[in-house]
Structures are given as C-alpha cells and as structure tokens.
Amino acid sequence: MQLAVRQEDADILLKQKNVLDELVVEKYRVAGQITQTALAYITSLINNSYHLQTSPKLTIQQLCLLTDSFLLKLLSRQYVNKVNEKGIAHPTTINVNQLLNGFSPEIDDEREFFLNQGDVVTISLGVHIDGYTSQVSHTLVIYPPSADAKPEGPLLGSNADALCACHLATESVVVLLGCSLSPEKLPANLKNVSNTVTGSQIRELVDAIADSFNCVVVPGSKIRRVRRFLAGQAEGIVAERDFKGVVWDESHQEARLLKQSNNTSTDLILSDSNKPVQTNNSSAIPTDDFVVVPGEVYQIDIRMTGLSDVNEIGIVTTEEIDHFTGKNNKQDFNAKSSIFIRDFAVTHQLKLKTSKKLLGEIDRQFSVYPFKLDYASKNFPINTESSEDEIKQQIAAIGQDMKSNRLGAAELSNRHLIQPKPIQTTKFIPLKEILLSANPTGKHGIDATKPVLPGMEIPLPNLGVSSLKLKSLLKTGRSINNVRESTTVAINENNQELIRLTGGEATAKSNWVHSQYKLPASLNETIGQLVQISKDKRFGIKIKEVVPYKVQQSNMSVESMQID
C-alpha cells in the first residue's frame, strides 16, 4: 500500500530537506560526535570491567542501559529548544559471537549475561537530531585480562580473518565513496567508461576482499543512502521509496558459488563498463545500477564471517530466535525481543489503561525510530554522573517500572501497533543438505516473519529454494561467528570533503589480529592506491573524521565532560 502524498510535499521531504547545506551538515556532525563519544564510553566500560578489571564485571544489560542513558545525557545538552525531535536512533545492542542483530536484553531479565575471554563482541548504537541520523557498529575482541592493557598475542583463526576483511572492506569503501567528489582520482582498476562511482564497483570491491580472506558477506549487509528520518530502521516493515544502495543476501552467495565453480581466482573482476547506469531509481527494490552523487549521506554496514573452520561448501544465512526457541529437546539459546518500532499505519481501540499510557508515551517520544520498553520508565535515563551506589538504585527502580510496561506492550504487540525487531543469529547450512532436500512447492513459499527488502523474498532463486524451505533447513546447520563494522559518511560537495561521522581511528581502532590469508597482487595494488588517495592531502581526497567529546570516567560514573 502506498500513501497518497502530494508531489510538492514529497519533494520537500525527500529532496529539499536532504540538501547538505551548512545547517544540515552541522546537525549530522553533532549527531556523529555524540555517537562517537558513546562508543568510546562503552568501550571504556568494557575495558575497565573485563581487560583491566579495575571495576566489577558489568552485565550486557547494564552496559546497554548505561550507554543509552549516556546518549540521552549528551543529546539533552545540544539543540535545546531548537529542533522538534532528537533522540536515540538505534538502541545500544551488544551482539556476541554468532549473534548478529537486536540483542539488547532488558534490565529485568532474570539471566545475567557476561562477556567471556575470546568473544568477538559487536557494539551498535546511534542517535538522530531532527531526523538526521548517525549510526556506528564496531567489533571488539575480549582478550585475557592484563595489567598493562595489552594482550599477550594477536587473535588467530576464522574470527581474525573476518575482522581483517571487514576492516579492509569498510575503509576501502569509505575512500571509494569519497572519490565521487573527484572521479578522475579513481584507481585504474576501478575506473569505468562513465567515470563514476557505481553500486557495482562497491559490491565487486567488497566481494573481492571477502574472497581473499576466505570470508562471506553475511546477508543483511548493506551500503545504502541515508536520508532524513530514513536510515533503514523500519526495513521489512515499511518499503522505502527511491531506495539507493548495495544489499547482500543469500542469492549473492549462490551466484558466488556458481562463479567459483568456473573460476577459482580472487582477483578483482569488473563488470561490463559499457552497461548503462541508472542515476534515478524510484523503486523500493535494491539494485546495483546507481551512481554515488556528491551531496548524499551513506551508511556503510558490512558483516562478515570466516570459513577457515568450515570444511565444506554451504550457505551462510540468518535465523530469528525468540523466547520459545530452545524449549524443546534442543538446548538452543532463547531470548525475548526487546527492541520495538511503532507501525503508524495501524490503529486500534485499546482496552488496558497501561497500554493506552504506553502508546501515548511512544507516540510522544520515539517517533519512527526503534525503542526499548525501559525508555518509557519514569526513572530513565540514569544519571551517569551519580555515584555507583546511586546508579545501582536507579537501575533497580527501572526494573520495577518494567512490569507495567511489559503488560502494556503485550497488547500493543498483539494488535500490531508496535512490531518487535527480531534477534538474529548467523548459521552455516551445508550445500549438500540444500541439494538433497525435497522441495515440492518450489520457490513460492515466503516467510512472512523474516524482515527482508522488497525483491529479496526468494533467498536461492537459481536452486528454487524458498525462504520457508531454507528456514526448515536451519536445523541441519551450525552456528557460526560473525563480525561487523558500520560507519556513516557525508559527501559534502560544498567543501569538497568527505565527513566521516562515525568510526575511524578515533573510536573504532582495529583489533590486534593475525590472518593466515593475504590479498592477491592486483587487489593489493588497488587498495594501496585507495589508501594513498586518502593520505595525500594535496592531490588526494579530503577525509574529515568527527572526534568524540573529552570525557573523564570513573568505573560506571562520568566525572567530567567537555562539550565544544
């Protein structure tokens, strides 16, 4: 269903409000600075708790709650009474090992989740100011505790391969997007006839890096344009008009396996440069036929998994888990979805007083962005500048408020007024299990519970395997770890610079890892040229990184904070 919107209003919302003028760039910059500061804050909490052990170990629930409170504290000091909306665009999630998305347990969860040595931990968070969104994801490695803050040796194995590939791919794409300001500076191996940066170039570069490290790009990875109030927060619920971006799903692994059966080379192979490229795409279906244009903002969100521990050919896919999973004879991990998003296309007359109160709070505070139930507590956010004892008391008070919030959320969810965002894990399914399975209905069965973008409902089109059939094959698969790096960049045409709003060396330093793989010569040369372009201040691309605020921290509390 498409809403009836006047063309004049659509132009204002989708075009005029997304022009990167000085005011809009400043809103993006401040949102990026807040996001960067929060990432540094939660990284410090983890280091103090698990690496340096200068404070008691914090649970994942406490880490998420403290970071969300810290985000709101920073937001409250910016654009006071100057914008109508500002808030958390992506609740803090901490996904460990095979967990991919959405794991942010509430503080009233009876189980205590701790991090362990050797875990790969992905932190994701984000904020928006007046709808201009900044998000970040960064993967950390939990090393054995050490007094000098330095591990005894690098991480090895498939996790190290994935971390290397993910870091290289993210940094390369950042520079590649910046080359849209001066396409003549593109490396020779990446140039095309139209002398532009296209979606096909982006996909081929990322896939070539993944293949070189024996990795797979996990379904759900994307490099997409971000616009005001449109940052992918409702994918699978609302189809976004004029979608522009590169998206990976299982069908691309299928095509990759077909290609590898004929060619085992991992060299960078470009598509036909004479193929016409679309610059205007009004469809909601993702396609690689687009051109990166200066004046746009992009979210780079790459997730990878290493295959060095896997001795067979197969497909990496995702599985949605809930609180019913694992309650049979299999001891699978189970958890309740804790992140919700409001569906404004649905209305219903509610019966419970708690439901009406909660819905009013949601409509007033959270807009079109995801939220957690503890956000609606009268004791949220926690004052992170309080003493540790006071912080623990505030956390306990929020846990008490969660009882009524859960009761109200149950009716809202049953009436589809709010939609839970699923918790996803990565799984590896052997190809032989897919080929030997019976598939009488073909590819016509669609899993309505799995959030996918339009046009990607059939995961394996060449094999004729539907999403329902692939879901039934998950029991034959095995869990596999994943890593993730995400950054937001703004291509500022006015100052001829690429502004990196999140990530980078300031807050998302690469982990100490060692991979047994290396880049082939041609790909190594291409990436080397991209690095040279980013470092050359005179003839290269100007890349400006947003740095975090200066924060002095003591265990859970913040002692002082300097805001520009």
From Swiss-Prot:
It is an enzyme of class 3 (hydrolase). GO terms for cellular component: cytoplasm; nucleolus; nucleoplasm; preribosome, large subunit precursor. GO terms for molecular function: metal ion binding; metallopeptidase activity. Its main location: cytoplasm. SUPFAM superfamilies: Creatinase/aminopeptidase. The keyword Cytoplasm applies. InterPro entries: Creatinase/aminopeptidase-like, PA2G4/ARX1, Pept_M24, WH-like_DNA-bd_sf. Transmembrane segments: none annotated. Its EC number is 3.-.-.-. Belongs to the peptidase M24 family. Probable metalloprotease involved in proper assembly of pre-ribosomal particles during the biogenesis of the 60S ribosomal subunit. Accompanies the pre-60S particles to the cytoplasm. Component of the nucleoplasmic and cytoplasmic pre-60S ribosomal particles. This is Probable metalloprotease ARX1. The gene is ARX1.
